[in-house]
């Protein structure tokens, strides 16, 4: 067995991870968390909440996992949320084209076009791994699970592919909650769904998974000089910039640069201080949950792999023994893409009024409608046209003026309908106005965390094999069971003292496990395998002097302390 197989074996035996629907043969892309896995995952999430809700001052929302078609049409997911697919001509099995290629030849397929993938398959004579048959042409496959709302399937919908859209949809409410004072942030933690083509990477590639996403709304002019950046500018990180990835003369090691975030921003490797700051927050979080620092790097997306909404994006990648570097966190500058997309498609104003330091005189466009003609032409929709024209930006207004001057029709698209605007419908003039502020559409910095991948990496990075034992060397904050409590033997009242001590731990909010089965060495081994940092043994000495033995997991050091002080001692260590 390789390391991955050993870890999966341990996690199944000890109640961390189980195959879903196992008694029915299981389905690829689904895993259950057992009792200890569920606690571990919750500990990872609670640490994440500490960083974003307590430390950063974000607030959490909770929105539906079913999203109407129009929401994901507006967000771009209907058109863009796809993977390359190949289907076998013989057995009709489907596979991810890029994954099939990477499994057969040493090549990075990230960002390759469908034609390039097709060429690689043909040139290298890649066949179906199941039956050896030839593949059909590479095509695209939308990864969203389709569903419908209500009887009859009349209202099309999808299971959400990300939690972020729920935050963007509620932006007006969130902004009101923060009294419309930028910057501010909202987070959401919950299930997301991706109908993966052929998930063959165990817990790494799931069809149903947990995301923790933070959306930080900021005036785009404040991204370059971000106040909080000063506190992290000297943090040195391993970075894999886009230009280095494309430089074939560099070795894998040479492509990684270790530099401070301050230098990375100064040298235009990272786009700006705001995104660099949240790269630092990500690093701190990953260290807090026990990720091995030597197995962490930050990789910049290449232009041809950038998401449809992103201006810059960095992945926190974690190294795994079987699958190599895997993306676990994406920190993206989503610009104003999402808010503008939902403004356009919903007709709602998702801008924020930003006050100037002092009022100033500016030139603005004013529109006077020919109400008689507009009312006659558009009837009940005339009001929609008027409001939509008033919302036009200066750039759009100049485009309108230029079009009408050429005696052409200007097509104004709104969420309700499209309007053909003619020159005779309106008069546009420039006027000077004294204003105290302006409306802007905020930009969004989004750190998006794949909780399941991160949780697996916490397990793998904690997994250790020594001559006589296997252990999970979790950091104390995420260990599912904090303390094992043992009576050396079940007589002379030792078991009763140990049982009472276990209950005392639990009353103090510490998960403790009582174990009186087998030799004491076997009990230590069981606790080591589930990552319990401390064991407390009640023995003959306890009956004499009211002390107990504490054994530390990593060092295996043993020492005695008074029984009545053991709970406080463990609490302090945790």
UniProtKB/Swiss-Prot annotation:
Protein name per its UniProtKB record: Glycine--tRNA ligase
Annotated substrate binding sites: 96, 162, 209-213, 446-450
Keyword match Coiled coil: no
Similarity comment: Belongs to the class-II aminoacyl-tRNA synthetase family.
GO cellular component: cytoplasm
HAMAP family in alphabetical order: Gly_tRNA_synth_A (MF_00253_A)
Species the sequence originates in: Methanococcus vannielii (strain ATCC 35089 / DSM 1224 / JCM 13029 / OCM 148 / SB)
GO terms, biological process: glycyl-tRNA aminoacylation
Location in the cell: Cytoplasm
Function noted in UniProt: Catalyzes the attachment of glycine to tRNA(Gly).
UniProt entry keywords in alphabetical sequence: Aminoacyl-tRNA synthetase, ATP-binding, Cytoplasm, Ligase, Nucleotide-binding, Protein biosynthesis
Catalysed transformations (reactions): tRNA(Gly) + glycine + ATP = glycyl-tRNA(Gly) + AMP + diphosphate
Residues that hold ATP according to the record: 194-196, 204-209, 327-328, 450-453
Alphabetized GO MF terms: ATP binding; glycine-tRNA ligase activity; protein dimerization activity
Signal peptide (from-to): none
Enzyme nomenclature, EC number: 6.1.1.14
The organism's place on the tree of life at top rank: Archaea
PROSITE patterns per the UniProt record, alphabetical: AA_TRNA_LIGASE_II
């Amino acid at each position: 067995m390789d390391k991955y197989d050993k870890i999966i074996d341990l996690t199944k035996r000890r109640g961390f991870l189980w195959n879903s629907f196992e008694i029915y043969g299981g389905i690829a892309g689904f895993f259950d968390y057992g009792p200890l896995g569920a606690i571990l995952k919750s500990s990872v999430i609670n640490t994440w909440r500490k960083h974003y809700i307590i430390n950063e001052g974000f607030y959490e929302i909770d929105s539906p996992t079913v999203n109407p078609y129009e929401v994901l049409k507006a967000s771009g997911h209907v058109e863009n949320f796809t993977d390359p697919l190949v289907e076998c001509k013989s057995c009709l099995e489907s596979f991810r084209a890029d994954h099939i290629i990477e499994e057969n030849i040493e090549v990075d397929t990230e960002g390759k076009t469908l034609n390039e993938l097709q060429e690689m398959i043909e040139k290298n004579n890649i066949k179906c791994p199941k039956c050896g048959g030839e593949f059909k042409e590479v095509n695209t496959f939308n990864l969203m699970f389709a569903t419908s709302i209500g009887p009859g399937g009349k209202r099309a919908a999808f299971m959400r592919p990300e939690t972020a859209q729920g935050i963007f949809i509620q932006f007006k409410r969130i902004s009101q909650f923060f009294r419309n004072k930028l910057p501010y942030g909202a987070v959401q933690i919950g299930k997301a769904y991706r109908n993966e083509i052929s998930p063959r990477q165990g817990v790494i590639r799931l069809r149903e998974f947990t995301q923790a996403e933070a959306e930080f709304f900021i005036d785009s002019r404040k991204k370059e000089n971000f106040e909080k950046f000063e506190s992290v500018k000297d943090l040195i990180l391993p970075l894999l910039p886009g230009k280095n990835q494309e430089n074939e003369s560099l070795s894998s090691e040479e492509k990684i640069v270790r530099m401070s975030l301050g230098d990375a921003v100064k040298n235009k490797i990272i786009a700006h201080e705001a995104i660099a700051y949240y790269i630092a927050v990500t690093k701190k979080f990953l260290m807090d949950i026990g990720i091995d620092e030597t197995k962490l790097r930050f990789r910049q997306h290449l232009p041809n792999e950038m998401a449809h909404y992103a201006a810059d994006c960095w992945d926190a990648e974690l190294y795994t023994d079987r699958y190599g570097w895997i993306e676990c966190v994406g920190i993206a500058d989503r610009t104003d893409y999402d808010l503008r997309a939902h403004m356009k498609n919903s007709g709602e104003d998702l801008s924020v009024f930003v006050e100037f330091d002092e009022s100033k005189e500016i030139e603005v466009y004013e529109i006077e409608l020919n109400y008689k003609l507009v009312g006659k032409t558009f009837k009940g929709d005339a009001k929609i046209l008027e409001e939509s024209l008033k919302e036009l930006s200066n750039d759009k207004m100049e485009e309108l003026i230029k079009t009408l001057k050429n005696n052409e029709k200007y097509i104004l698209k709104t969420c309700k309908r499209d309007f053909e605007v003619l020159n005779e419908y309106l008069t546009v003039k420039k006027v000077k106005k004294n204003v105290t502020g302006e409306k802007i559409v905020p930009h969004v910095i989004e750190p998006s965390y794949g909780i399941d991948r991160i949780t697996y990496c916490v397990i793998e990075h904690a997994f250790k094999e020594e001559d006589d034992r296997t252990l999970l060397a979790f950091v104390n904050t995420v260990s599912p069971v904090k303390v094992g409590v043992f009576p050396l033997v079940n007589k002379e009242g030792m078991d009763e003292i140990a049982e009472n001590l276990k209950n005392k731990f639990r009353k103090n909010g510490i998960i403790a496990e009582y174990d009186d089965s087998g030799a004491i060495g076997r009990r230590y081994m069981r606790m080591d395998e589930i990552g319990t940092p401390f064991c407390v043994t009640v023995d003959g000495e306890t009956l004499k002097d009211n002390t107990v033995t504490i054994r530390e997991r990593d060092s295996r050091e043993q020492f005695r302390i008074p029984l009545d002080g053991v709970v406080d001692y463990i609490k302090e260590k945790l």
